[in-house]
Amino acid sequence: MDLGILFGIVGTWLLIVWTLLLGGKIGVYIDIPSVVLVFGASITVLFFCSPAGSIKKLPKIAKRVFFAKAPSIDQLIEDMVGYAEIARRDGILSLENSIKEVDDTFIVSGIQMAVDGTDPELIEQIMTNDLDNLVERHDSGKGLLEAIGKYAPAMGMIGTLIGLVAMLSDLSDPASIGAGLAVALLTTLYGSIVANALALPLADRLAKRSAEEVLYKTVIIKGVMAIQSGDNPRIVEQKLRTFLPPGQRAAGEEAA
């Protein structure tokens, strides 16, 4: 797990709980019907705006946010330059043996098409389509989390209004008004917490993960195209390092 995510989640929730404890009895902030309404309705309302198949992927999306490792662009560039050196020294057909131990299917498919003599424009089109589909899947997952972040506060407000109506319908006991109002406001609190301490931060993190993977695969596409065109390995490296920030770019060139 990314330590930054772990620190962010644990730290945020600890601060929330600590603030609740400062307010007195923690029990006054717990109301099961309010929890069920906010959490349950925030999920069920997704069926209005998203296919059921997409909603089933929520656990997988969360797993990706928490456990997916950020790809190393530096290592990727080093690998692509290595393939360029092999292709220049032994011919592009020799890469067929070099990719047998590679786990990344995107790299394998791209280089295999180059080895097979596929038209360069077709290679780029196929790989770009694959990348576009990846972006679409990531956007779908991000959209689900953003929808939860949008609807949870609304569900909380609905719960608060229900509670207020119930409270105001019976004012025979003035002493119970304060307690009733407190319970009514809990759903608004829960909705705000779900949105701002869970769903929206996860959506932002998924967007960052997506951007990292898009950059990674874009470098692969450019690398495969450079290898296929027979570029000098040094030129391949210079082309690919343009995708890095200037500081990393210079550091990588010095290491090389």
Model features per residue range: what roles?
Residues 1-7:
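Membrane-entry signal-anchor segments at the cytosolic-membrane interface
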Residues 4, 15-141, 213-256:
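Large intracellular
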Residues 7-10, 14-26, 130-209:
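Helix-termination/interfacial motifs at the ends of transmembrane alpha-helices
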